[in-house]
C-alpha cells in the first residue's frame, strides 16, 4: 500500500480535515478492516501529543468499520479531522504516519505547507483531539452524512 493525500474536504467552520488514500500498488487484491494507526510528527520527528481518537465528530463518520476489499491498483480511504487552535499552536505537524489495520509497516507522508493546520494546540484545548475514520471503500463514506 502507498499513502497519498486524498480529495479536498468541504469543511464546517473551524474544522481542519485531511483525506487520505491507501492505494494497492500490487497485482494481488487485499482487504482492510478497522481503523488505521495515525500519528503526526513535528520537524524534529517528535510525536505531537494529540488525543488520537477512533471516533466520529462534526466531519468524520461514526460508522463502525466494515470489510473493505482493495483490488489491484485500487484504493481505500481514511479521513482525519481536528478543530482549529484558537489560542495558538504549540507544535506544527510536518509528517504524517499511518499504519494500516492489522499491519505493522508504517506509511509516511510529508505534509504540504497548506495542511500544517494539523497542529497541537496544547493540553485541554478542543483542537488537540484528532478524530480518525475507519478505512472505507469510498472517500464520501469517511465523512459524516
Predicted feature residues:
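The feature marks short-to-medium sequence segments in extracytoplasmic or secretory-pathway proteins
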Residues: 32-72
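Low-complexity, acidic Ser/Thr/Pro/Gly-rich terminal tails and inter-domain linkers that flank the onset
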Residues: 1-12
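Short, surface-exposed ligand- or partner-binding patches at beta-edge/loop junctions that are enriched
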Residues: 84-112
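Short, solvent-exposed loop/turn segments enriched in Ser/Thr/Gly
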Residues: 12-19, 91-93
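Acidic, serine/threonine- and proline-rich intrinsically disordered appendage/tail regions
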Residues: 108-145
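Short, solvent-exposed, Trp/other aromatic-anchored flexible loops in extracytoplasmic proteins
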Residues: 58-93
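Asparagine-centered strand-capping/turn motif at beta-strand->loop junctions
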Residues: 20-27
Amino acid at each position: 500500500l502507498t499513502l497519498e493525500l486524498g480529495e479536498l474536504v468541504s469543511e464546517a467552520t473551524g474544522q481542519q480535515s485531511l483525506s487520505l488514500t491507501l492505494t494497492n500498488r500490487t497485482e494481488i487484491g487485499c482487504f482492510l478492516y478497522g481503523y488505521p494507526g495515525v500519528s503526526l510528527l513535528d520537524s524534529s520527528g517528535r510525536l505531537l501529543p494529540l488525543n488520537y481518537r477512533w471516533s466520529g465528530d462534526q466531519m468524520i463518520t461514526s460508522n463502525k468499520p466494515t470489510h473493505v476489499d482493495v483490488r489491484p491498483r485500487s484504493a481505500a480511504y481514511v479521513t482525519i479531522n481536528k478543530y482549529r487552535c484558537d489560542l495558538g499552536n504549540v507544535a506544527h505537524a510536518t509528517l504524517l504516519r499511518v499504519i494500516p489495520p492489522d499491519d505493522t509497516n508504517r506509511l509516511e507522508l510529508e505534509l504540504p505547507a497548506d495542511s500544517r493546520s494539523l497542529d497541537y494546540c496544547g493540553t485541554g484545548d478542543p483542537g488537540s483531539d484528532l478524530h480518525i475514520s475507519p478505512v472505507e471503500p469510498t472517500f464520501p463514506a469517511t465523512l459524516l452524512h
